[in-house]
Amino acid sequence: MKHPQFLPTWSWRLNWDTIRHDLTIGSCPRGPADLDRLQAEARISAVLSLQHDECLEKLEIDYPRLARYGRAQGLRMEHSPMRDFDPEDQRRRLPEAVRILHDLLSQGHRVYLHCTAGINRSSLVAVAYLTWIEGQSLDDAMALLQGARPEVSPYWDAYEGCGQDLIARHADQIRQRIAELSRQNPGRSAKIHRSRAEREMIRTALIG
């Protein structure tokens, strides 16, 4: 798949779309007034920023100050930076972001997940969470995301590469699980057992 790119005419504006009751994706808040608006209009209780320092500097965002303000307003403020337009960096950093998103959602937060434009990195983390943690199919997860925010466009190299890394790291446990599944369900194909074992191991590796 093609990598997403910003249009030359892209300029920042605060915008968001509600994916479901507990997850909203959008562009970055740049100051306290933006957090106030998100809290009042999107009714969020937590913010997960994926912006790298390079993004913050380019947009002149004082993230420590913004985070302090958000916490003072009762928001849970989390930061898991990923480099923009860098699928290799996103591949490495994706597990941490998925873990944080899971932690927030499992505690009942209404999460505002954002990168800079709310197109690439935020959708990458969302689709990884929906498929790897919640067990949705990739088609269903993307239909959910694009149904609410049509412009989302994750780096598939990062998504697939991270999944491959997790599988390779736990190859022995996956083989053991395949053997268990084969004994329990001898009538099913090895392909089905492998797919299930890999899905289970990715989820376990991410959240235990």
Which ranges hold each PLM region?
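Short cysteine clusters
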Residues: C115
